[in-house]
Amino acid sequence: DKPCPYFIRSKTLLKDWHKQASLPQNMKVKIGRWDIPGRPIVILVDFKSLYPYKNDLYGEMWNRYGVNSLPAYGDYDESCIFSYASAVVIESFYKFIQGEKFKVVAHFDEWTTGMGLLHVKYTLPQIATLFTTHATSIGRSIAGNGKPLYDYLAGYNGDQMAEELNMVSKHSLEKSAAHEADCFTTVSDITAKECSQLLERTPD
């Protein structure tokens, strides 16, 4: 893989955790810093080894939260497996640092990270979860199909439109993440109204 020019790898950062981390299916990580102001620590997750187990993951999410992954297509698999892998890393690191001694918050951004939020919520409910959306997936689809989103917002039902526009899986995941998150946020008043109508939870 082509190296990221903004990532500076380190063999000493978090080395004690990395040395003992037992991640599933031979999952690999790289640890370093982003080469930006503040130089934050970052863990890059290689999630390719989890692809053969995606149906097991989707079955768990259906049984626990009713997330319907059967009609999924496009970028759904990649997003879900990445976010699950990231949640597994959070879980591993939390246990290593004995996270119960701290107030830990895990922030998940957009539907693409929703499955990670749901995994953390199930395995480590003591971690506070924050879910942010910049626009709902079904709202984007409504507008992208040439339908007037905001002019008739009050008349739309998110679940119904997801069926009509073949967005069931993404909408199902996003709606579940929004409802299960300890704190649900968005970026504007108009998007908050969109969330209230289409996801049936008003942002906090």
Predicted regions: what is each one?
Residues D1-D204:
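Catalytic cores of nucleotide-sugar-dependent glycosyltransferases that transfer UDP/GDP/TDP-activated
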